Amino acid sequence: MGASHLHDDPRPGSPVDHQPTTWGGIIKKWPKQTFLIVGNELCERFSFYGMRAVLTLYFFNILNFSQSFSTVLFHAFTVICYSSPLLGSILADGYIGKFWTIFFISIFYACGQILLAFSSIAPSGSSHHPLLDLLGLLIVGLGTGGIKPCVSAFGGDQFPAHYTRMISLFFSMFYFSINAGSLISMWLTPYFRSMSCFGHDSCYPLAFGIPAILMIVATLVFMAGSFWYKKVPPKENIIFKVIGTITTALRKKASSSSTHQRSHWLEYSLDGHDCALSTECKNLHGNCAQRRYIEDIKRLFRVIVMMIPVPMFWALYDQQGSTWVLQAVGMDAKVFGFEILPDQMGVLNAFLILFFIPIFQSIVYPTIEKLGFQMTMLRKMAGGGILTAVSFFVCGIVQLFVNPTLPYIPMANEAHLTIINTIPSCDFNVLIDSREPFDLLRKSGIAPDDSVRKPISFTGDDFFQPNITFDNLAPNCPKFTAEPMLAPATSYVLTLSPNGWAYNAVRPEKPKSGKGELSMGLNLIVPCDKIPSNVTWEQCNGTEGYSGAIALCKVESDVITDNNNVCDPTAKGKFYVLSNANPLDVHDFSKKSTVTAFGRTYSPIEMKPGTYRLFYTDDSRTHFTPLNLPPVQQDHMGGQYLITVSTRSKNDSEVLATTESLVSYNRVSILWQIPQYVILTAGEVLFSITGLEFAYTEASPQLKSVVQALWLFTTAIGDLIVVVIFMLNIFSDVAVQMFVFGGIMLFVIFVFILLAVFYYEYADYSNESEVLTEKMIVDDDHTRI
């Protein structure tokens, strides 16, 4: 538009169109289509953070990956999410513009969410897993990253450039929609996950399906404003321009003669440049546009050097969604009668960031400066990095208290053995090979022990067959020798019962579902001819064990008046069935290694804490016959227990039971995670928000979009660091892992402080003759643009 037409142009955005200063004027001139962009962002952030909140537990529980590999996949997904914005920026700025980039990639994004939701319907172990899951996540990662640099910038495009007050208000609304979407979804989606659907104990199809629906809604909401949007056509991509300049400089430096030296290697790109022939230089009245551009790139490199600690910050920060969630699974989630799901703790960060930002701006920073300490940007970042490291030290200390409740896991060359004595009135003195003998007392009662006995360890390179001698002084108690065959890297339970001794492999582990459950298994050493006569669905001879199902039904009292009313198969959280049974060889005491009877060992199931009675039940779950036993009561989550049921003697139909604690229940409250979240969020305010401000203000106006892309890419690098470290499988202890990450962060911040003191000087663009209006893109993760 020529200068002669400026005063005749009545359209908004021309110099005569003054920025409104009153609320009435702002409302009148506000571009109404921006509300659709804000609504789109709200739905998209709900979609992304809702899916991401439950992702680690989905890897762990449904895809059955290890904790370490689940963490690797979570961070690999984040790498994709924060690498792909570069592609979205190139596509939008250089080819099809922001509007069409958002539209096409949103459809692609929604397809990924739908594919992930569809794949999660298949049961664990299905051939659909994990190919469809990972394909869906790849599409989601490319989609969310592709639109990330476009949506907020597209919203800013709807305003005249000089409407700075309205643009600021828009980004405040945009920022609020980001945090509102993430806050709501991170609280609700774990609840969706904890429901039951499609025959599963969890409902990941709902947890992924609702975000998929919200992504479809986000796309439709965005397209609803198509007719009214201001669509800025694509222009030269500044990222390509910078890369081209650097490439040209390196190429010309390599081919230049030794007599033709430049003061800086970037200045070689000026070879062949003639200001007299450049339109840009003419418009700057003698100033060389290309030389000033080269100076801007030099400053950019100085900013990049100061961004060295940023990837390490994200390497720590993003472990909220992986390592910290898995830590919460091993903690007591009951708080004042309510239950907090482990993947809901991330809500604390989303809430605290909204609370801390005004507190730091209005109270913390002014107070510190009144004490005579100037809060420069680099000082804030150094303080934030230190706080981030401290949060990981706190997390490591919490983990030290969690560790004693973790299961004993045998090494690759080790076998573990736990011996359970259920024989009434018999205590034993046990001698294993040439080890020191120890006393084995009889267990009485069905109530589980409050503590877990450390298993006996055998070490070697091959199978173990220890000679275990059981001796006693009682005349009616057996004296015998057991020689179980034990495999390395396996845990076993050896059970002494009135019918003989038996041993079987067990897998000590905490419940993985993250729904406040415990794990209960069963060894049943009851011959079929000793079960009640009304259990007609099992026909066998006297030596065979009962192989039908056992129901655990939640009861409120010890008195049972109607079996079928106690057991309601439709009652969620009150009815469970042990049905996956394997034969259990029962060896005779007097005949070495001779199998004289058979029992059944039932694989453990996850169930809610409470008081339960045991019932024989048929396949249709319509008939229930109680075992004449006291109820089993356990009010704590996170433990693993083994119930052993046997007859009182070989010729007796009366049954007795004991319960062994194989894995301790969760003893450390999940509330102990609050300090690490508080400290990390404070570090985020100091480091991340200030770091964004530093990177944005220290770059020249025309290179701010490059800095935006680099800022996003630091997140990808940070998560890649986590992926590499976990792939190396260095840590076996989460506490050590947290301390090491915190220590690395402190070292990086120490280097950063040295750079800030001896290397960096703040840039000054106040005398720039060219004013470029750039809109800051607010990232969806509080501070990433």
Curated annotation (Swiss-Prot):
This is Peptide transporter family 2. Proton-dependent uptake of di- or tripeptides, and to a minor extent tetrapeptides. Transport is independent of sodium and chloride ions. Protein shows high affinity to peptide substrates. Glycans are attached at N467. It comes from Caenorhabditis elegans. The gene is pept-2. The chain crosses the membrane at residues 46-66, 72-92, 99-119, 134-154, 167-187, 208-228, 303-323, 345-365, 382-402, 670-690, 711-731, 738-758. It is a multi-pass membrane protein. It comes from the Eukaryota. One of its GO terms (biological process) is protein transport. Gene3D superfamilies: MFS general substrate transporter like domains. Keywords: Glycoprotein, Membrane, Peptide transport, Protein transport, Transmembrane, Transmembrane helix, Transport. The keyword Glycoprotein applies. SUPFAM superfamilies: MFS general substrate transporter. InterPro entries: MFS_trans_sf (IPR036259), Oligopep_transport (IPR004768), POT_fam (IPR000109), PTR2_symporter_CS (IPR018456). Expressed in vulval, pharyngeal and anal muscles.
